[in-house]
């Protein structure tokens, strides 16, 4: 019957030439068209051309067309359909403001399009009435017309018997009702479906906009004028909530059986704020849980009225706003830019604290954000949206859903054609759209078997810290679960009760006689006065404490390095007579390591002070510690002892040398391994002072330059040495170009404290005028006391010495301990240190500090009792004054500090300076990985990334199918030392560095997990805990000392070998022993002098590098010859070469050795080739003389072994008066040589020498079968 009526309608409409419907996208055809070809498929988009009061979701053609355009382009680009297969026609569904006329207009237009074969699918509809009518009509056309709508959410459209081809891209209000039910609904044993709600509200009232049922509705005299009064979307949404609640809960069904608490109104009429106040007074007598549904402007007026009545600030009322159209992007809905009264915005903000909003969940994918930008650009460029409407384009979920609708239709159409079925049959298309999931612009889109999308809803709440509405929970339509992702903030600190104690009308509270009220009033007045007195007294005391600034430390009170240097000089004078002390003025001390082992072996006497120091460092815990240490150290006494004299000769330890450290700050083991000046905690490599300065860029402190120590040299055993830097630094270890500097220390009131310099520019802040907030921050820091955080001693704000003073922990930081490969940490020690860290972090999170913000392994320090403490926390307002100089710090060090920072804080340009507790949990996970694997911070398996590259990759957001960059974890779960990691600890680490901060555990959960692992190792008895830690520490003592001793011996041997090359071995050994070298006279020695003839001319014709190369090659060759004879090379000066025989080892054949050496040198010169002048013969001139000399060491810096006497001068004259490539011999040397057979000498004759007169000299021609080489006739 319906088909016959449709055919009749087609005939009538054709006769009328189709002039009823206005076609926005294409011209109307005047004649009836022929049957359609297979392609294209005609899709009609039916939406209002302009906004209307009936359109609550902002759905217009101007907004939808750019979205549909992009969707069609993406379908063609993805090859789901070829170009030209879809023909879009846009209709204005609102030619008439009257909704009933608009409904008829749309229905007639659809029938006409069908009759003209221009209808294959329908997309759109902003009102439910027109949608319902058209859906019913098109169900009977041919095989049905598929309709896809982004609205149509009322439960009345759920019936697929009446609406068999309707697909709803936003689902139905039933999912909204389910989310409300799980959030607030009261549930008891009679409930059909249990709710997980913690609010458990039963007394609800609906306060919403609806023209048809409004209490302020204007009754028209003519009933025909009321046809436009239709039900609003608020009514449909609240109707769905009522229906769902009564289905799921028998209690609600019983309570709402007769009447549903509601208060509808017409917001299109002018409503004064006083009217809203009157309505809210009436509502407050019925319920304190008010469910709102109206436009954003109306909701703001209602909340302002509630604020004026005190309902929004009392904490007794809660407002739940249903706003599905605005979306979850409305972060500050209380602000109105056109509101000239700024106080109204502030008042509205305060009122919105009592408001919770439920809206469709907004996608936060990057693809969706890019899609929004593309749509806005298309709307302005192609459709001139901004100029036509006068406002910026704004996207919402109902508009963006058109993209998913086009994509879904294209997928179903493609599959229908591929299956060989009729693509114009509505059943074939609809059956392929329902019950499927596909990837849309908002992510995964799921359509149920009823044609409704599984929509997600967000619960938004005003975050007082971020000053905006944020998502605290969301409802997943696919899983029908409400998931919490944040914390609700309630006025008054807790949610209001469902029913006030006295009832809404105060009828449940009985009255009392007048005298009772007087007594109660008097009592309350006294309490108020007492309270005011206490308040003002405490405030007065607080102000006094703030003004006193007990934390303030004057720079003069810090006994720093200058004072320590003066004391050091005084103490050095007293120690000069000790045999075991090497004065710093001794040049040999500067040429060797500044940190050296004092003896090769240890004797019983040297261990007495060590035991004493170890006992005294335990603060007198019990005799058990001393006994245990004695057992561990007694192994050294079983070794062969060195006699005291030998020990002193080698710079060994004595009780006196150990006793001098009793007043210092170094640990006892420091005295076993290293000789350090008192109060100096610096550590250097075993290289010479000059080499150390060159390699580490360190300069003399007297010159005011900075110092740095290499990372390699910094690594020492756990608890072995205390450290100190002359250039300051921070409490944490500061990395600068592969160097490490520990914190500066000072003496404050007799106690060693750590100094952290604040990088505050003195020029910018010549005076620190602290605000009240900063003073409060410093006071809170001063009041903090806990076993596992460093004690805040105070701060210095004297210009320009801005610094923070804290407790000094001499064992170094956790980072240094982990980086030192020599330190073996067993599982119990790791758990113990980890437990200390968690306890310190737990205290901070529950204190007024709230969070650390800069947690890293270098901010975890270990004190002398092996207790780990958290440091460098708090004082965030003071740190805000600091400036970061990237050039001074270095890029590597700057980004390395960020490796512990949580990804959400890296992405947030306005991250809170104090950090977050969830950020601290992430930092804890990175530290935990460092401790378990000991591969360094953020160790990766097969990637060699710089800290900058790691930070950038961690900062970059990741999608759900991507794995975020995290430190490498072995698949077998093996940690450092091939120990299998505890599964609980591994799971805890992975959970703590989760990408989503909401998925990270609280610190209380972390503490509980770590405490369960360390239960056997940690007791409540401090002494027992200390005993265990001391025993663990002492277990490695023997191996560490032995290993360091061997390292020392190897370094000592290298230094001695180098020194023996600079000085005669006997002289060097005398200086090493600390004894002065006495000058010694020698009756007869032979001295050799030589130089290069024409060297000055040769140098002027050569480059400096060529000259250096020449001399180096020549002297290396000479040194090889000299080593074959019993001679001593004295020195080389330029081209001059001086050798002596007969000293320091006395021998009679000194002239013989020098003569043979001279002949060998001439033979070496014969074959010597000058690199840059290979064809030129090097001309060596040699002179030698015998006589008496005096030899001794001259100078304290760069000591030289020098010869003195007339013999030296005569030898030099013999050389200068000789000839090239000949050996000039004096009369004295001639007399000695002639006593031995074999030497061939030729008389030269008398030669006049400066200062000597005429001297008879000789030429040495050969020795036995060795002759002078033949250099040619020129040199014969």
Swiss-Prot record:
Start and end residues of each Protein kinase domain: 717-1013
Biased composition (Basic residues): 567-577
Coiled coil region boundaries: 1017-1063
Residues the record marks as carrying a glycan: 87, 196, 338, 384, 387, 414, 428, 444
Topological region Cytoplasmic: 537-1276
PROSITE patterns in alphabetical order: GUANYLATE_CYCLASE_1, GUANYLATE_CYCLASE_2, PROTEIN_KINASE_DOM
Keyword hit for Membrane: yes
Family in the record: Belongs to the adenylyl cyclase class-4/guanylyl cyclase family.
Protein name (database record): Receptor-type guanylate cyclase gcy-28
